């Protein structure tokens, strides 16, 4: 399967800024995108339509939502349904991002509902998991990741594996901090995630792509992508500028 290089633009960029960055990115990458790479950009909801227009004729580029609500429609002020994301041109959605877990209080059960509902609606999902620093220091890495996967995938059957499900490992202590998990730490965590997915879904589970996220930058992308069981990257701050993100895509 192709390496997936995903950008999470979080709460940055106006529509015009998103369109300009998207065009710069296409100009920098489209003609030289390796056959084994695909690009996903998750902008703010307001910029989805603009980026869809920018990427619609560019092979290997897709857009996704940063979040979703597990309902078809309803009186859920401020939320967005999977069908609305699809209507805006999205093929993907993020669920369980650490900032939603730890800033907005989303629990594993909420993440599970969003993940299952989105898959059933026809979106592909990047499910984010990862431990906090105190959990790693307490030797609880396996317990934390196993629990997040067990609950987060509780209602996801093998129908969606491996083609529609991606798991992103993002150690919380490395997100936006400038700290990067060392190669041995990344390999350990990704091997653990791979074994847990294989135990749950068998051979197809072992084929689920696992991304690394956490202070990914142009100067560490190639090393991260070379590590065992790293099938792509989830990029935050370094994806906001086309110059730096294009270097990561082509690393």
Curated annotation (Swiss-Prot):
Its EC number is 5.3.1.1. GO terms for molecular function: triose-phosphate isomerase activity. GO terms for biological process: gluconeogenesis; glyceraldehyde-3-phosphate biosynthetic process; glycerol catabolic process; glycolytic process. Keywords: Cytoplasm, Gluconeogenesis, Glycolysis, Isomerase. It catalyses: D-glyceraldehyde 3-phosphate = dihydroxyacetone phosphate. Gene3D superfamilies: Aldolase class I. InterPro entries: Aldolase_TIM (IPR013785), TIM_sf (IPR035990), TrioseP_Isoase_bac/euk (IPR022896), Triosephosphate_isomerase (IPR000652), Triosephosphate_isomerase_AS (IPR020861). One of its GO terms (cellular component) is cytosol. Homodimer. Belongs to the triosephosphate isomerase family. NCBIfam families: tim. Involved in the gluconeogenesis. Catalyzes stereospecifically the conversion of dihydroxyacetone phosphate (DHAP) to D-glyceraldehyde-3-phosphate (G3P). This is Triosephosphate isomerase. It comes from Nitratidesulfovibrio vulgaris (strain ATCC 29579 / DSM 644 / CCUG 34227 / NCIMB 8303 / VKM B-1760 / Hildenborough) (Desulfovibrio vulgaris).
